[in-house]
Amino acid sequence: MKTLLLSLVVVIIVCLDLGYTMQCKTCSFYTCPNSETCPDGKNICVKRSWTAVRGDGPKREIRRECAATCPPSKLGLTVFCCTTDNCYH
């Protein structure tokens, strides 16, 4: 009986979502010293980069954020997705 109860407890612990929340850098700069906790349902860190043309010439832009899905890359837009805390490179 004790073995059955212990087995049940182990199965419950393994199967339950224990409230883990993803930590991602969320900013629009090349370096992000701090990370933020992603909201529920957004368990992917996304880094988008592109070149924006402004009055002073082209400039590389970067945006880091939490997301529910990994968006596709497009012409002129590079997307990097990862699923571990602060996993940008």
UniProtKB/Swiss-Prot annotation:
GO terms for cellular component: extracellular region. A motif (Cell attachment site) lies at residues 54-56. GO terms for molecular function: toxin activity. Residues 1-21 form the signal peptide. SUPFAM superfamilies: Snake toxin-like. InterPro entries: Snake_3FTx, Snake_toxin-like_sf, Toxin_cobra-type. Disulfide bonds join C24-C45, C27-C32, C38-C66, C70-C81, C82-C87. Expressed by the venom gland. Belongs to the three-finger toxin family. Ancestral subfamily. Orphan group V sub-subfamily. Exhibits M2 muscarinic acetylcholine receptor (CHRM2)-blocking activity, but has a weak binding activity toward nicotinic AChR. Moreover, it inhibits collagen-induced platelet aggregation. This is Long neurotoxin homolog NTL2.
